[in-house]
Amino acid sequence: GGGDASLIGVGAGAVEIGDAHIYSGTSGWVGTVVPEQMVDTGAMMAAIVGANPETFNYFGELETSNKCVGWVKDHLALDEIGVFLKRYGNATDSLEQVEFNMYDYLEEVIDTIPAGSNGVIFTPWLHGNRCPFEDPNAAGMFFNIRLNVGKTELIRAVVEGICFHMRWMLERQELKTTKYQKSKTVRFCGGGALGETTCQILADI
């Protein structure tokens, strides 16, 4: 048995020492299977008992992961959503299905923008930040907005910002975990992993 974080790793296939997985839901984390308890107080990372009591899961958490994409849907992407509803809206769809379809459409939209979002950078700290530095006052920001930047670049920058933060946490974890075994595959799971474009962005980063 185990908690949600440990069992999500099992479901993703991260069960052997050194296996790593990235989860992106409302919050997000990077978890690596390790054989012993460990703590990195400088990065606010710690290992908890895994679903297998002989192993531990070493976690670093992002307070708002795919929640940032939800914020985009509610505040930045209204024009794109209006286009979506006109093109693809179906009165017979459930609200849940419409929601999934809208996220799929936003994936198509950001796929039209080259990697790097025209230089725009986003920090995914919409509810403070936990790791690899703790600051409850940290906030989300866009950098490098110029006259030639549109909302589509901003939307893609949000996804890229989440993925860069995940890489940051993974690299910090590897300072301690590679003495065991470095994972050859990083598994990606959660609602954020449902989009092919997001998966490709994370893989590229």
Feature-to-residue mapping (PLM):
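Active-site core segments that coordinate phosphate-bearing ligands/cofactors
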Residues: 1-205
